[in-house]
Regions:
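Extended, basic/helix-rich recognition subdomains
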Residues: 155-216
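Structured mid-to-C-terminal alpha-helical surface segments
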Residues: 190-255
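Conserved NTP/Mg2+-binding pocket subregion across the NTase superfamily
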Residues: 65-168
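Catalytic metal-binding acidic patch
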Residues: 25-29, 33-64, 74-82
Length: 255
């Protein structure tokens, strides 16, 4: 997959639809952090100067459908206002959101728009943009994005793993690595990718949990097709990690 060509295509389409309203387009996630695989997704934040009307939102969704070929997990993007990027709000309001979860609804209902509300996940995404993001188009990250409070980031990453006990049995690789990078941040203050969190946990965690993390890492890098599901081991791992995360969170922010 030619990701450079794909990113150029994305930028061209966003510029064409949004015109002068587009402040910038920013890459976060695995592709920004140097650990992209074809099994991952492409993660984008777009920043606009003023609110978008529904016709413009729909036009951008239609252009998004034309982007490809995409990696296995597709493309996820959110659009926020410049004023909110600069003066951070949590949970963050957003103008428009697209991910494969919404694709079928967007295709079936041209009046459907995911936007005009708030998203607790965005604090985590914006922190990655701040610390490790890549400018695809527009103003620099330093010009556009204000500081993200540690408390908001922690709330966001813990919200993301809120259903980990059940989720790890359905999506063991991603939930395992999300738990790893969450604990990595709480212990070390490192805004890490999934795979970086996995590598750290293989050295940090008790030996009992090494096989679960090792399998997740192997699945992520593609050395095994998928992570095996051992309900007992995965459940014990999730319980251990959630307890460790809760302890570290309490020590950092007292909640």
């Amino acid at each position: 997959m030619n990701t450079d060509k794909l990113l150029v295509d994305i930028v061209d389409r966003y510029k064409r639809v949004l015109g002068d309203n587009l402040v910038g387009l920013y890459l976060h996630g695995s592709l920004a952090m140097g650990c992209f695989t074809p099994r991952a997704d492409i993660d984008l934040i777009a920043v606009v100067r003023k609110p978008m009307d529904n016709d413009t939102k729909r036009a951008l969704i239609d252009e998004t459908f034309k982007i490809g070929p995409l990696p296995e997990k597709g493309l996820e993007m959110s659009i926020i206002l410049e004023e909110h990027a600069r003066d951070f709000i949590h949970p963050m309001p957003f103008e428009l959101h697209y991910s494969p979860v919404h694709k079928e609804r967007y295709e079936a209902d041209r009046g459907y728009i995911c936007g005009g509300t708030t998203d607790r996940d965005l604090a985590a995404h914006l922190m990655v943009v701040k610390r490790r993001g890549v400018v695809l188009y527009g103003k620099s990250i330093e010009e556009v994005f204000g500081e993200i409070p540690k408390e908001a980031f922690i709330d966001s990453i813990i919200y993301n793993i809120g259903d980990a006990k059940k989720g790890i049995l359905k999506d063991p690789m991603n939930i395992t690595l999300d738990l790893c990078r969450t604990l990595y941040y709480l212990k070390q203050g490192i805004v890490a990718s999934k795979i970086e969190g996995g590598y750290w946990c293989t050295a940090y965690l008790p030996e009992e949990h090494h096989p679960v993390v090792a399998d997740a890492v192997k699945a992520y890098i593609g050395s095994i097709k998928q992570m095996p599901v051992n309900i007992e081991k995965l459940s014990r791992f999730a319980e251990y990690m959630l307890t460790a995360i809760s302890i570290e969170k309490h020590s950092l922010i007292g909640l």
